[in-house]
A protein has these predicted regions:
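Bacterial N-terminal signal peptides that target proteins for export
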Residues: 1-9
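Feature marking well-ordered beta-strand scaffolds used for ligand recognition
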Residues: 20-393
Length: 393
């Protein structure tokens, strides 16, 4: 079965009831969930050009870097850029459109602002997401910008996998290694130490298709506790060797849905689901326990009626909150759960956004936690939610 991804996304929409969270999986039947929490305060809305809109946002040290597709990137001061910006009143520092590379447009999807072991934040890694067909092909490069001057980014390097396209990144910043999900190309590890320029092909450390050549379409990767994990849309949730990238656990464990994003925290991991797989919607967050060696085993699932896709997922830096974005149908938006029991998250907040939230990133400005959410593609905007009232012991 093939689905179009990238700039042209086709998602089958099924009829659904109203919002009704349940937890579905091994163990006894749970009692009905408590009444869901209300919407967190909306601190600010930053509209972006309707040039296919906004995708990921990377937040670090009071700077928010927006991936604004064919507009390129927008760099915002939200509390650390020296321009007087705050989460309630962001200030634009610069906008920059990288070259098209192997695509017909910039198509900037995701970013990672690299802080090296010396604390220098020079390089910004960008992923292009070009047209793709689930289970068959994808396109788009990794771009590298020099952000020595936030007001004047410059493009300095790139990395390309012929016949495959970049999606999401993670970094081992101490080891100076970039891990990149490349859809049908699998997972790539790149040495990004020292100065970067031109074609980075010679810096490739390893590459793997965890599900094999016929069952690999990797959405994202994450390094946690010295262990590397990958969420594959076709072949499930994997544990990989961080040095060789060879699979060492998991895989072939989400047969009924297409996989999406992932987040790992301590002994638990959470993965999203996407679209429609033979009549089953992407309305689930999978809950995994990681054993002593790090291998995942499924313990439960959050099922959210009234959505088609869980497109982005993150746990707060203190482990208190699980936050995810949802698209499709009547109950799209932003979902917030408390992780008092990591195996049984409890919903405490929800913001309905009918257009859908495509991605969400958590960032702390001062002591307050915020969610930076991408409303996309209609009326595209960055929505900044104040989660401080929910971020309590």
């Amino acid at each position: 079965m093939r689905r179009r991804l990238g700039r042209w996304i086709i998602v089958a929409v099924l009829a659904g009831a109203g919002c009704d969270d349940t937890v579905d999986g091994p163990g006894p039947v749970l009692p009905p969930p408590p009444p869901p929490g209300g919407a967190p305060p909306l601190a600010a809305t930053v509209t972006v050009p309707p040039n296919y809109g906004i995708h990921d946002t990377f937040v670090r040290d009071g700077i928010a870097i927006l991936c604004v597709w064919n507009t390129g990137i927008m760099i915002l001061d939200v509390g650390g850029g020296g321009r007087g910006g705050t989460p309630t009143s962001p200030v634009t520092i610069s906008t920059f459109a990288p070259s098209n590379g192997s695509l017909a447009s910039p198509a900037i999807h995701n970013a990672w602002w690299f802080r090296n072991p010396s604390g220098v934040k020079r390089y910004l890694f960008l992923g292009q997401e070009g047209p793709a067909t689930l289970g068959a092909s994808s396109s788009g490069d990794v771009k590298v910008l020099d952000l020595s001057n936030l007001a004047q980014p410059t493009e300095v390097a790139f990395y390309r996998v012929v016949g495959a396209g970049a999606h999401n990144f993670w970094m081992n910043e101490q080891a100076q290694v970039l891990y990149a999900a490349f859809y049908n190309g699998g997972v790539v590890a790149l040495d990004v130490s020292g100065s970067l320029a031109g074609d980075l092909a010679a810096r490739e450390i390893a590459r793997v298709q965890p599900g094999g050549s016929d069952s690999t379409f990797v959405w994202g990767v994450m390094l946690a506790g010295g262990r590397l994990y990958a969420s594959d849309m076709l072949s499930g949730f994997w544990q990989l060797n961080p040095q060789t990238l060879q699979p060492i656990g998991g895989g072939q464990n989400v047969p009924e849905r297409f996989g999406s994003d992932l987040w790992v925290r301590g002994e638990y991991a959470y993965t999203g689901t996407w679209g429609n797989r033979e009549g089953t919607r992407g309305d689930a967050v999978k809950i995994w326990h990681l054993n002593g060696s790090g291998a995942p085993s499924l313990v439960d699932s959050i099922i959210v009626d009234g959505i088609n896709t869980v497109s982005d997922i993150e746990v707060s830096d203190n482990g208190r909150l699980l936050v995810f974005s949802a698209e499709g149908q009547s109950d799209a938006g932003l979902y917030i759960y408390r992780l008092t029991d990591p195996e049984k998250p409890t919903r405490i907040g929800y913001a309905n956004v009918v257009q859908g939230i495509h991605t969400v990133s958590l960032g702390r400005v001062g002591t307050k936690l915020y969610a930076f959410a991408a409303r996309n593609p209609s009326n595209p905007a960055l929505l900044i939610y104040d989660l401080s009232s929910l971020d309590t012991p």
